[in-house]
Design a protein with these regions (language model features):
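Catalytic-site signature of metal-activated, phosphate-bearing donor transferases
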Residues: 1-160, 168-172
């Protein structure tokens, strides 16, 4: 990565940002399947032309002309598989459900199941999670569970006034 940055001529570039491939790790294992690689992320940008996007889910850089570099950033996403399943407990699905509710998104009784199943199939089959063995299966199951929980919570906000009243929608993050 350092060598890729050194080779850039930042004073004469038409690009306002540069994206690196994120090499996501679980423990010491590189996860190449389930859409986790190459997972491009902008980490070098001209602050006069690009800026943080106004998105509540994740911090991201809004750039009009980013360039993808042939270099990796190693990202230790989770120390072990257990942390991958602790993620729903950190309430990312609840935050996503709040954002969807604020945007007027609706769910029905089948939404949690269908969205959860769709997320699992997308990760495991279409993004080749089956090629990653246990890690690929685990990532796909985690994606399905997160999607299921997100829509189940959205449905709960729609159906249960006490739950809705107890939530602070001004504080999503």
């Amino acid at each position: 990565m350092v060598e890729a940055i050194r080779q850039l001529d930042l004073s004469a570039t038409e690009h306002d940002a540069f994206a690196f491939r994120r090499r996501n790790m679980i423990g010491s294992r590189w996860i190449r399947v389930c859409g986790w690689y190459p997972d491009y992320c902008i980490r070098l940008y001209n602050r006069h032309h690009a800026r943080f996007a106004d998105v509540k889910q994740h911090a991201s850089i809004g750039a009009s002309n980013p360039k993808r570099l042939n270099a990796d950033i190693v990202h230790y996403s989770f120390a072990n598989l257990g942390q991958l399943f602790a993620k729903p407990g950190r309430n990312f699905s609840g935050r996503a459900a709040k954002i969807m509710f604020q945007k007027g998104k609706r769910a029905n009784a089948f939404s949690p199941f269908t969205h959860g199943l769709n997320a699992f199939i997308r990760k495991y089959i279409f993004q080749r999670g089956f090629m990653g063995g246990v890690d690929g299966m685990t990532v796909a199951i985690s994606a399905g569970l997160n999607s299921y929980l997100k829509y189940a919570k959205l449905l709960e906000y729609q159906r249960d006034p006490k739950v809705l009243e107890a939530e602070d929608f001004k504080k999503v993050w």
